[in-house]
Amino acid sequence: MHSFARHRHSPAGKESAKETKGLILNGGWRYDLMGWFHDTFSFRGQWRELRKRTADLARIQPGEQVLDVGCGTGTLAIEVQQRVGRAGRVAGIDPGTRQIAHARSKAARRNLPIDFQTGVIEQIPFPDQTFDVVLSTLMMHHLPAGLKRQGLAEIARVLKPGGRLVIADFKRKQERQGRAARFHAGGSSMQDLMALVKDAGFSEMETEEMQPARFSAFPGAGFVRAYKN
């Protein structure tokens, strides 16, 4: 069974407080409810499609090391483990302790060696240049701009040179937000997100959109793919 080295990182050289916050993240019951909603109803298939498209855009290869930031109950990480195979390694971090417990249980039932840890994007608990790929789905909108900057800097730190980052998030200012989006902070501006990704040391950025299906609670999403310089 593969394992990752643990790392306690603070830019100032000291242990910093975990700061990730938001309506879902601060309200444990809301966070657990959304995890259950995603896994049970799958936005009428669109959450499943979003996971697949995220992994496809990342161009994940057998044997690679992949981190899922904001992994929730581990559904995407489990699917990614199947892509990297036993020679690869997958880790997931999430601020929700119940989410991580559920993710570990799901992986254990499938006998998958995924390293799920409670953690936040602004303090990723892994050494520099550990991962080939970092994924983030439907979590950036929880964060104010300052935490996005910190988190993207941390992602750049743990990615290997040339590593790939794929972010998928609800889009901002949808004409039909849908019930699911009301649990969140209004979605993300893809232009603003791309600027932050570039400032964090990424290049070759590409974007893609996923439109909502008719009568679906899913509000539509945007994807950003970029490579670490």
Regions found by a protein language model. Give the residues of each.
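Class I SAM-dependent methyltransferase SAM/SAH-binding core
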Residues: 67-69, 73-123
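A short SAM/SAH-binding and catalytic strip from SAM-dependent methyltransferases
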Residues: 133-146
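C-terminal alpha-helical "lid/dimerization" subdomain adjacent to the S-adenosyl-L-methionine
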Residues: 15-22, 44, 164-225
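Short glycine-dipeptide loop
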Residues: 86-87, 159-164
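Conserved class I S-adenosyl-L-methionine
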Residues: 2-59, 75, 102
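A short acidic, Gly/Pro-enriched loop at the edge of an enzyme's catalytic core
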Residues: 122-133
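Glycine-rich helix-loop-beta junction characteristic of Rossmann-like nucleotide cofactor-binding loops
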Residues: 56-61, 83, 124
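A short glycine-rich, Lys/Arg-flanked "PGG" loop and its adjoining helix->strand segment in the class I
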Residues: 149-161
